[in-house]
Amino acid sequence: AKDVPEVFGLSSSSVSRQFIQATAHKLRTFQERSLEDLDLVGLILDGKSFGKEEMVIALGITIDGQKVPLGFVEAATENEVVCRHLIQDLVDRGLQYQQGLLAIIDGSKGLFNAVTRSLKGYVCVQRCQWHKRRNVTSYLAKGQQARIKRKMQKAYEKPTYNEAKADLLSLKPELTLMNQSAV
């Protein structure tokens, strides 16, 4: 594969420069596009690792459940300053939040503070179930994790909030016996 550019009379560095220029243009277009026409009901913010790089990613959720990539920022952590900057960029590009948004985040205090302070009173925050499940089970012995994950998932699938809450609260005594930190 590394010999392919030479077959066409191109140097590897020339191909690399052209690739960087083309992708930089597409990235700039993505990061600067207007968000005004998006009718969103939800906003997912999460930090992700890509090799040695860390990114905070923003996805919008439409009324019909479609996820729309909105933007991202390279950052070492999900700290409040970085996340507020990302949210402000989304607002500057036309993110409509005045009708209210559901923000789905992990347990990061930086993300929570950034969302609640940036969208002042127009946001309801929900903890991501996947992150919560992972955090709880990380305190348990390997042999206990799958069973507790299943019980938590079964609770999340209940048809009403009250039923789900009751099932999750019923796990508390069991988790307390396994490891108090899991509660």
Briefly describe each language-model feature range.
Residues 1-10, 175-183:
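Proteins with a high burden of low-complexity, intrinsically disordered sequence enriched in S/T/G/P/A and R
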Residues 2-105, 109, 113-121:
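RNase H-like nuclease fold core
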Residues 113, 117-183:
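Extended amphipathic alpha-helical interaction segments
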